[in-house]
C-alpha cells in the first residue's frame, strides 16, 4: 500500500534530523537495508550447534548457560572460546569464581597464551572490566564465570550476618541495561555462566528451581541453555566421563526447546567423535552390526569407545562423516533427535 506523499516527506525530514543528531543509520527503513544473516560461534558440540538452529551461539548477543554443579557449564564455555579463537577471535574470561583451570582449558583447545583473564574482587569491578573491554571494539567473546560469584562490594565490606536483599539483582539489571546495546554494536558475544537455586517456600505448580542474579538476565539473554549430567560413562568399570543433556530453553534466533546429548570426557571435554557416531547411526550413515561400527567399507571399531578412538586419530574420516551428517540433517526441517537408548551402557 502506497504511503501518503506528505507523510513520506515528514518521515524523510525526521530521519535527516535524527541522523544529524545521532549519526547516520540511527533510524532506517528495513526495505533500504539488506537483512544480514546472524553469524554464530560453534559450541564445539555438533548436536548443540544443530539444536541452536544457526550453527552455534549468536554473535553480538547475551547467552546464559546454567545448570547444577559439575554439569559441564564451564567446559561448554571453554569449548566456545576455543572455537572462537580458531577463527581468529579475541576472547576474555572473567573468572569471578577464581577457579579457572588453565591446564584443562589447554586440553580443550583454548589458546591460553592469548586469552584475556581477569579475577575481579567484586561484582562491580567485574562488570566495569566487562564494559570497558566490550566498548574497545577489539573483543569477540567474553565469558563471565559466574553470576553467583559477582558479589556486590557492599556485601564484601559488610559483616558476615548483614542482609543485602536484592543488591546483586539490581547490580545485574543496571549492568545489562548499559551493555546490551554496546554488545550488538561491537558484535561481541557475552556468555554468563549461572548456577541454580531452589525457590524458598515453593508450593504447587511450576519448577522449584531458579537461577541467581534476579530476572534481568532471563529477559536480556537471546539464548538460554540448561545443561545437566544425565549419566556416567564407564569403561572396564572405570568412570571415564559423563553424559550431558543441553536444552535450549530460550532462543530468539531460532525455534527453542530443542535438545542435544553429548559425552563430556574427564580431562578432554566434549567428545565430538561420540556425537559423530550417535548421529551417524541414527541417520544410517554409520552401520551398527552387533558391537561393530563401520562406515562404508571401513570398520570403525568394536564398541563405541574403540570407534571414538579411531575417529580421534583419523581427523579426515571424522570430518567426512560430519559433513554427511550435516548434509542429511540440513535437508530436514526438524533437528534429528539422538537415539532413544545410548549405544553403550551408562549409569
Swiss-Prot record:
Task: Quote the record's binding site residues for ATP.
Answer: 67-74
Q: Which UniProt keywords apply?
A: ATP-binding, Cytoplasm, DNA damage, DNA recombination, DNA repair, DNA-binding, Nucleotide-binding, SOS response
Alphabetical list of Gene3D superfamilies matching this protein:
P-loop containing nucleotide triphosphate hydrolases
NCBIfam families annotated for this entry?
tigrfam_recA
Its biological purpose = Can catalyze the hydrolysis of ATP in the presence of single-stranded DNA, the ATP-dependent uptake of single-stranded DNA by duplex DNA, and the ATP-dependent hybridization of homologous single-stranded DNAs. It interacts with LexA causing its activation and leading to its autocatalytic cleavage.
Q: Which family does it belong to?
A: Belongs to the RecA family.
- Kindly give the InterPro entries that the UniProt entry links to this protein: AAA+_ATPase (IPR003593), DNA_recomb/repair_RecA (IPR013765), DNA_recomb/repair_RecA_CS (IPR020584), P-loop_NTPase (IPR027417), RecA-like_C (IPR049261), RecA-like_N (IPR049428), RecA_ATP-bd (IPR020588), RecA_C_sf (IPR023400)
**SMART domains in UniProt:** AAA
A GO BP entry: DNA repair
Q: From which source organism is this entry? A: Helicobacter pylori (strain P12)
Pfam name, any one: RecA
Q: What is its main location?
A: cytoplasm
**What is an example of a GO molecular function annotated in this UniProt entry?**
ATP hydrolysis activity
What is the name listed in the Swiss-Prot or TrEMBL entry for this protein? Protein RecA
Q: Where does this polypeptide localize?
A: Cytoplasm
Q: Which GO terms describe its cellular component?
A: cytosol
Amino acid at each position: 500500500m502506497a504511503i501518503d506523499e506528505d507523510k513520506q516527506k515528514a518521515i524523510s525530514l525526521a530521519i535527516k534530523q535524527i541522523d544529524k543528531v545521532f549519526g547516520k543509520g540511527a533510524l532506517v527503513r528495513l526495505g533500504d537495508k539488506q537483512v544480514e544473516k546472524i553469524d554464530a560461534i560453534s559450541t564445539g558440540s555438533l548436536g548443540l550447534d544443530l539444536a541452536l538452529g544457526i550453527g552455534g551461539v549468536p554473535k553480538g548477543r547475551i547467552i546464559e548457560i546454567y545448570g547444577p554443579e559439575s554439569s559441564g557449564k564451564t567446559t561448554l564455555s571453554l569449548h566456545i572460546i576455543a572455537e572462537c579463537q580458531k577463527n581468529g577471535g579475541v576472547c576474555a574470561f572473567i573468572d569471578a569464581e577464581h577457579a579457572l583451570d588453565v591446564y584443562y582449558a589447554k586440553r580443550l583447545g583454548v589458546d591460553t597464551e592469548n586469552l584475556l583473564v581477569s579475577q575481579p574482587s567484586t561484582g562491580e569491578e567485574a562488570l566495569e572490566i566487562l564494559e570497558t573491554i566490550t566498548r574497545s571494539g577489539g573483543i569477540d567473546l567474553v565469558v563471565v564465570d559466574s553470576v553467583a560469584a559477582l558479589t556486590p562490594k557492599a556485601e564484601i565490606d559488610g559483616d558476615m550476618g548483614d542482609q543485602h536483599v536484592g543488591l546483586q539483582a539490581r547490580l545485574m539489571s543496571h549492568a545489562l541495561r548499559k551493555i546490551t546495546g554496546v554488545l550488538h554494536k561491537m558484535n561481541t558475544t557475552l556468555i554468563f555462566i549461572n548456577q541454580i537455586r531452589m525457590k524458598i517456600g515453593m508450593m504447587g505448580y511450576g519448577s522449584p528451581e531458579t537461577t541467581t542474579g534476579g530476572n534481568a538476565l532471563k529477559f536480556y539473554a537471546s539464548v538460554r541453555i540448561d545443561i545437566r549430567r544425565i549419566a556416567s560413562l564407564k569403561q572396564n568399570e572405570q568412570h571415564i566421563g559423563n553424559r550431558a543433556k543441553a536444552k535450549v530453553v530460550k532462543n530468539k534466533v531460532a525455534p527453542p526447546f530443542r535438545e542435544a546429548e553429548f559425552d563430556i570426557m574427564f580431562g578432554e571435554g566434549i567428545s565430538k567423535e561420540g556425537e559423530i557416531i550417535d548421529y551417524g547411526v541414527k541417520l544410517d550413515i554409520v552401520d551398527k552390526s552387533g558391537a561393530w561400527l563401520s562406515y562404508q567399507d571401513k570398520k570403525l571399531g568394536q564398541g563405541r569407545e574403540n570407534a571414538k578412538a579411531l575417529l580421534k586419530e583419523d581427523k579426515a574420516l571424522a570430518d567426512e562423516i560430519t559433513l554427511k551428517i550435516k548434509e542429511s540433517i540440513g535437508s530436514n526441517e526438524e533437528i534429528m533427535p539422538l537415539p532413544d537408548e545410548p549405544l553403550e551402557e551408562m549409569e
